[in-house]
């Protein structure tokens, strides 16, 4: 509501449009946005802890889902980095039985981390293929990497990399990967991370293939 009020003030004819006034309004909007995101993270943490995540499985076009994610991050580059996102999707990928909303948010989280934990330039590759009876999704970047000693607990709550603790520019690392792991678990899948700790990180998600549920014939 506070953000809405500030934005309405910006659009109002009576609003002072001087540079100083606009700057103060933008600062208030950012403060309330940060507070809202913090509240959402706390709510997500409570929900995951108390209830877990339940996937709403439905036929999903993985190619379209990945296209939507990459397009969103290419267009909404508010931090001014040079971002190169490439996709490697098998041309014969059929519909997958997954929860599109949960999977979208999980992959978006990994993509956001790849951008956040990198220098001024970052190259990201997102892959998708079907192998045997499972889906394999990968998110690979050439960012800072994750030290081997930290990789074993990064999917636990609030376990944020030591090198980024106290860094206000890189919030949310602790809950984000915990949430991603919860999404994968809700799909009865598995997630792993590969990194030499110096440069680059790859997350590999494996989700078992499900058969589409047949509708019961009406009697």
Please place each PLM-identified region on the residue numbering.
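Short conserved segment of the HATPase_c
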Residues: 146-158
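Short beta-strand/loop element within the Bergerat-fold HATPase_c
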Residues: 121-133
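Short helix-loop "hinge" at the ATP-lid/N-box region of the Bergerat-fold HATPase_c
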Residues: 114-115
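Short alpha-helical segment of the dimerization/phosphotransfer core of two-component systems
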Residues: 28-36
């Amino acid at each position: 509501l506070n953000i809405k009020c500030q934005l309405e003030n910006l659009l109002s004819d009576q609003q002072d449009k001087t540079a100083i006034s606009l700057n103060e309004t933008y600062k208030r909007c950012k403060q309330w946005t940060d507070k809202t995101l913090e509240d959402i993270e706390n709510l997500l943490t409570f929900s995951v802890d108390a209830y877990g995540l339940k996937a709403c499985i439905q036929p999903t076009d993985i190619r379209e889902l990945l296209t939507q994610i990459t397009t969103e991050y290419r267009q909404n580059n508010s931090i001014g980095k040079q971002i190169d996102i490439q996709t490697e999707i098998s041309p014969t990928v059929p519909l997958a039985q997954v929860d599109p909303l949960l999977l979208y948010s999980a992959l978006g989280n990994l993509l956001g981390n790849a951008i956040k934990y990198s220098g001024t330039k970052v190259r990201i590759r997102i892959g998708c293929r079907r192998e045997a009876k499972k889906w394999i999704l990968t998110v690979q970047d050439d960012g800072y990497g994750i030290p081997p000693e930290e990789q074993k607990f990064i999917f636990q709550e609030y376990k944020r990399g030591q090198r980024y603790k106290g860094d206000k520019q890189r919030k949310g690392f602790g809950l984000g990967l915990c949430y991603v792991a919860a999404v994968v678990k809700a799909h009865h899948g598995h997630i792993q991370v590969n990194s030499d700790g110096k440069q680059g990180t790859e997350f590999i998600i494996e989700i078992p293939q499900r058969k589409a549920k047949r509708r019961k014939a009406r009697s």
